[in-house]
């Protein structure tokens, strides 16, 4: 549907790079639901250069996920360039993305993430240095500005383009907003009109209809979906289908949700081992169960699970219980 450098995406729906979430197990699951591009969670440039074991694990890519964008962050040109070169030469990622959007203080105090948004000249300098050092296309994920008084989205996007960046993903919130308030799609539209490289819009795309509205109202090349896909890869499938056909597919049934949740669990166990995976899966299971009536009790029980068997037994028992309630409701209706 559109290209980032020489990488062709089959549609306009992109999975956002969410920290603590977008490992290979989650990305592959979302890819199977039709995402045109999946983005890995951000990785520290210095951690790559220190050969940190956990970080090296975060660079793992399953070939079935591709095309894939791998995101790095840092505040110093030398280390960012060296980390980008490592990713370029030692991973099968298709795209190298630079994080300029993370609003978390522990990132911004290191002059990384959203701190870049205050200086278009630094953006140009850093991006051009990375572009010159690697063969893979380089992109940037950014927010619209630091705060309401410092919104340099257009200048920053132009700096990325001038530096040789192949696309910009723009979240229509400031750093100060974090994830509160509403995303400003007008700024996204302005940025799209100001550069010739692809622009991917991000922020408040919660339904397939939102995705279409963003495309129509801003003219962006793609839509990036983040939190709406947590425990809900059907959001990706339903959005792709809606954009292609205009038809809105039904939400998944309980059994289908639990089945995919268990698949996700097993992939996470394969990736990280049972002990770590089960603990990490607690939050994912809560997301999968969201919106299913009567889930509070089982969500609480899941938070005490330590093994795969415990978690699967709880999920299976809840499925039977929830389906019985659905059947009862249907009879009453």
Positions of predicted regions on the chain:
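Alpha/beta catalytic cores of nucleotide-metabolism and tRNA/nucleoside-modifying enzymes
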Residues: 1, 9, 13, 19, ...
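Glycine-rich, positively charged N-terminal anion/phosphate-binding segment
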Residues: 1-3, 18-94
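N-terminal small/glycine-rich loop or linker at the start of catalytic domains
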Residues: 2-14, 48-67, 102-112, 127, ...
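Hydrophobic faces of well-ordered beta-strands that scaffold small-molecule active sites
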Residues: 13-17, 38-40, 68-72, 96, ...
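Active-site beta-loop-alpha junctions enriched in small/polar residues
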Residues: 18, 43-45, 73-75, 101-103, ...
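Short, glycine/charged-enriched secondary-structure capping and boundary segments
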Residues: 29, 53-55, 85-86, 110-114, ...
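Alpha/beta enzyme core
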Residues: 81-112, 120-197
